[in-house]
Amino acid sequence: MKQVFLSTTTEFKEIDTLEPGTWINLVNPTQNESLEIANAFDIDIADLRAPLDAEEMSRITIEDEYTLIIVDVPITEERNNRTYYVTIPLGIIITEETIITTCLEPLPVLDVFINRRLRNFYTFMRSRFIFQILYRNAELYLTALSSIDRKSEQIESQLHKSTRNEELIELMELEKTIVYFKASLKTNERVIKKLTSATSNIKKYLEDEDLLEDTLIETQQAIEMADIYGNVLHSMTETFASIISNNQNNIMKTLALVTIVMSVPTMIFSAYGMNFKDNEIPLNGEPHAFWLIVFIAFAMSVSLTLYLIHKKWF
């Protein structure tokens, strides 16, 4: 899919032509769409389609006619009826006339620009647009990390009494997400630092310098949060694995003790079911023998139960 946007000081609209000062947004573009843009702006098609590889690393490539910036952005995906965070590459290409973004699927990081929910955003201010995207991306990482933290607290409350593996598996999924986030954030940080350096060929104004510095701070804060949450999740995973095992052991112990208590009346009643001679059966001839035997069996079971409770085995 190809979208072309143009903004002025008074309006923001989608157009059909490739004009100077536009923003071209490519979402999983076809080969023909890629060739059209590559030929129009003298871009190597391999660079244009590089962000469509989900394994592409964050980097900056500087060519004579354009600069390619690739960063990892967070998105959500559904697996096993649950929502998880993953990262995919976003490519940003800046030329003399336009800015091009390319990715595998629609991204939340670009929605605020498409829906015009961000102030001081203009497609013709290409450098600032790049820094605004990077800043918004850092904010999304912080939001995603906060969401992961809340989710881990919910799982923690369920795990205290759990004997199942589902919650533990979900906790491990969150831990894996944090690991991917940390890797993506650190490569994004290197890209941002390179943009802030004097060797960057992207023109920056004073306001842009401040925005880029804020972006670096937000990214570093996200890295610190990911480190903290990652350590907490790792500890939680190990701790609750032991808790689940302990809960299962307690259930097995309870079942074993119930079996012992129930075996007392079973042994008594089984004795009366054996082939004794009439004069050998205890309480033979007693008119209330049945109820007396039941009472004795019940009393012995209760006594055994109280003894086990006293010993804190129950």
Question: Which sequence ranges carry the predicted segments?
Answer:
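Peripheral, non-transmembrane regulatory/ligand-interaction domains of membrane transport proteins
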Residues: 1-197, 203-204, 214, 218-225, ...
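Hydrophobic alpha-helical transmembrane segments
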Residues: 37, 121-122, 196-213, 231-249
